[in-house]
Amino acid sequence: MKASSGRCGLVRWLQVLLPFLLSLFPGALPVQIRYSIPEELAKNSVVGNLAKDLGLSVRDLPARKLRVSAEKEYFTVNPESGDLLVSDRIDREQICGKQPLCVLDFDTVAENPLNIFYIAVIVQDINDNTPLFKQTKINLKIGESTKPGTTFPLDPALDSDVGPNSLQRYHLNDNEYFDLAEKQTPDGRKYPELILQHSLDREEHSLHQLVLTAVDGGDPPQSGTTQIRVKVTDANDNPPVFSQDVYRVTLREDVPPGFFVLQVTATDRDEGVNAEITYSFHNVDEQVKHFFNLNEKTGEITTKDDLDFEIASSYTLSIEAKDPGDLAAHCSIQVEILDDNDCAPEVIVTSVFTPLPEDSPPGTVIALIKTRDRDSGENGEVYCQVLGNAKFILKSSSKNYYKLVTDGALDREEIPEYNLTITATDGGKPPLSSSIIVTLHISDVNDNAPVFQQTSYMVHVAENNPPGASIAQISASDPDLGPNGQVSYSIVASDLKPREILSYVSVSAQSGVVFAQRAFDHEQLRAFELTLQARDQGSPALSANVSLRVLVGDLNDNAPRVLYPALGSDGSALFDMVPRAAEPGYLVTKVVAVDADSGHNAWLSYHVLQASEPGLFSLGLRTGEVRTARALGDRDAARQRLLVAVRDGGQPPLSATATLHLIFADSLQEVLPDLSDRPEPSDPQAELQFYLVVALALISVLFFLAVILAISLRLRRSSRSDAWDCFQPGLSSKPGPGVLPSYSEGTLPYSYNLCVASQSAKTEFNFLNITPELIPAQDLLCDNASWEQNTNHGAAGVPFASDTILKQAPPNTDWRFSQAQRPGTSGSQNGDDTGTWPNNQFDTEMLQAMILASASEAADGSSTLGGGAGTMGLSARYGPQFTLQHVPDYRQNVYIPGSNATLTNAAGKRDGKAPAGGNGNKKKSGKKEKK
């Protein structure tokens, strides 16, 4: 007991003095920082301030990146304070087993510059394990002839703790026959032996019950117990005896399984059955049974499995020899294992800095590599190198530690990944080697700008495209990776106005597809150019530009538009008057049409669809000129109608129609009866108002009848027949030929006051059907005296509608037409630069004015309108001249009627004013006088 306590004290002193002795001789070993902690510390417990012990400033810790490099990281470094913290459970018994000194060695790495420090943490044992017996009950058979002092070895209790906390002593409960002794194996383990103090008498006590207790040295101590059941047997008084108590054997670790190790022999002086000995392992670890085999009859020991010096360098085998009388003897065998170069070196990558930027300079540290060989001596010396790549080398930083650094420029676009083979070779004979492959990924740097597939793009887009349709796609590639290679597209410039770019086109930032934001119109925009940019997502971003020219193609989407003949404001057709004596080839009129398209789509042709008298007129295919094909015959009607179609050259062609009303007459008097024959167009609005009035009248008949009666009485008292005063006594008015309402409206500065009967229910002008021989033509108009006598004013001084009637003057010479005013092709006359296209309203007003003026002149026989060969009857082409503003390709299709002559206003003369020009503002007096 005293010897065991002395050894424990020596171990404690060594644990205390060893760090102190190492500090006195710093040059003897590499610089290493040691800490001492108890096992089973809580996680994040502070071991010590590693930064302070290494001489590192706390301010430099983020830059130095101090960290622990170990295969199993029991510790970690606080990056802010530099404290070494416990990061995992530390169980001394699991890590070091029964070793008296448990040290955890690991490395710490600091960067900028790169340094490696060696750290050792001594793990101190705590009393966290209770001594335990393998069996809760031990059965012994002892012969009654056994002499006092005989010992019986017992299975020891197991305590995983070491030092003072390990198993310290055994004690047996008080009894009369047995005592307890403590023994120690060569490796220092304690086991109990039961000592017989007095001779046994089976007849007196055949069974003895004992309690064995194992106690450790902890504070407080822990203990474990087992029961010993001793059965007293009959006499077999000679136990087996081994030739020696301890055997020693040396083996190489490369011996094969089944290799003979040793044969033990025991003798028994008994005879017969009591002398038969059986051998068995006694009180050995399972590891011993795994590697060694014992023949229970012969005592021969052989290897059972491959031995490994790196796992265990020695084994202790306890052998028991027992006879049939359960008498036994014990011996131990010490087996020493010799090292052989059977372990290849190991390559351990402790840190890999991946991915590596492709612009890293030579000498950049990529990885930290550690080598290890479990063999000893020369077999454990290792040399390391990189195979087959000239851009990387290994630099030795300390024993068994290397840095993998770059030795050349890198290009990710050329080689995005490296598989580096690192080989380690030991110094054994023959040498063993091993290798490991380190995969190094090269990270991308934005060093490549996007590149378009074409230097420029040109696309053709047909007009009237649907909005949102794709019209082109541009594509650019970037060999960079990730965001550096992700290309986005945008429009950066255009020959369009800045505000119009987004309304015309847009580009998809991801796909590069160019979309039309609106339907293109070839007539408005024939081509435009965009500057598109491809930009990557790098920092800084790189970009490239390309031009895209968009040509808008023409479609036949515009039908021809007939400018002449035009319809009146109420939809009525105009008339052209042709002299009866017109010769074949006489230019009657010209159909004028335009097409907003271009090219063949605007090439117009003119065709006669229908004619009231086929063969009487001919139509120019390209000019639209209507000429007489033959002279007017006696059987030909005076009124002719031509339906003309105007077609363009598109596919399919579009067309428009125009209706020409031609009248063969030598004077305007012949035209007026034809005009009166036309039916008055129905007024849907008037009919609707009529039905509304009827409906309202049915609801309140009595009220409306009273109102109508009152109004009628008032009108009868106050009405004056102003219209009848305009004529000579004896004349009467009756409804005559009706003129279309469009002839009573206009913008020309003339007033035509026609006498209207008060009983007339019609709203149009009525001409008097008068015999020229009885009454002069000038009597149709009111003279000044008659007008003055019949002028009435209301109570408030406001003149009545009849007060606005003025005397009409005969037309001046501006209504005579010269040869230059006859129709012709475009460009035959010098057009007025300020002229505009004629419209239906203007044509109607001109025809209205000419009809009324002709009616006035016809009364005195002085009219020349329509009577001469050089005139064109009632055609509206004698209005102010205009200039066509159209594409120059088809000017021959444009007809410019009329002239620039300024019309002299007869009313203006009467008022003392200069006559207004043909293009001036014209007073619409027709409607007012009609009212």
Swiss-Prot record:
Q: Which residues are glycosylated?
A: 419, 545
Q: Name one GO molecular function term.
A: calcium ion binding
**Sequence ranges of Basic residues compositional bias:** 921-931
Q: Name one Pfam family in it.
A: Cadherin_tail
Q: Does the keyword Endoplasmic reticulum apply?
A: no
One GO cellular component from the entry?
A: plasma membrane
Mapped to this chain, the residue ranges on the Extracellular side of the membrane are: 31-691
Query: What is the protein's membrane topology class?
Result: Single-pass type I membrane protein
Residues in domain Cadherin?
A: 31-133, 134-242, 243-347, 348-452, 453-562, 570-675
Q: Which residue stretches belong to region Disordered?
A: 814-840, 901-931
Q: Where is the composition biased (Polar residues)?
A: 815-840
Q: Which residues form the signal peptide?
A: 1-30
**Is Flavoprotein one of the keywords UniProt gives this record?**
no
The superkingdom listed in its UniProt entry is Eukaryota
Residues crossing the lipid bilayer are 692-712
Instruction: Return one Gene Ontology term, BP aspect.
Output: homophilic cell adhesion via plasma membrane adhesion molecules
Q: Where in the cell does this protein reside?
A: Cell membrane
What are the UniProt keywords, alphabetically?
Calcium, Cell adhesion, Cell membrane, Glycoprotein, Membrane, Repeat, Signal, Transmembrane, Transmembrane helix
Q: Which residues lie on this side of the membrane: Cytoplasmic?
A: 713-931
- By its UniProt entry, which InterPro entries does this protein fall under? Cadherin-like_dom, Cadherin-like_sf, Cadherin_C, Cadherin_CBD, Cadherin_CS, Cadherin_N, Protocadherin/Cadherin-CA
According to its UniProt entry, what is the function of this protein?
Potential calcium-dependent cell-adhesion protein. May be involved in the establishment and maintenance of specific neuronal connections in the brain.
Name the chain's protein.
Protocadherin gamma-B2
- Natural source organism: Pan troglodytes
Q: Name the gene.
A: PCDHGB2
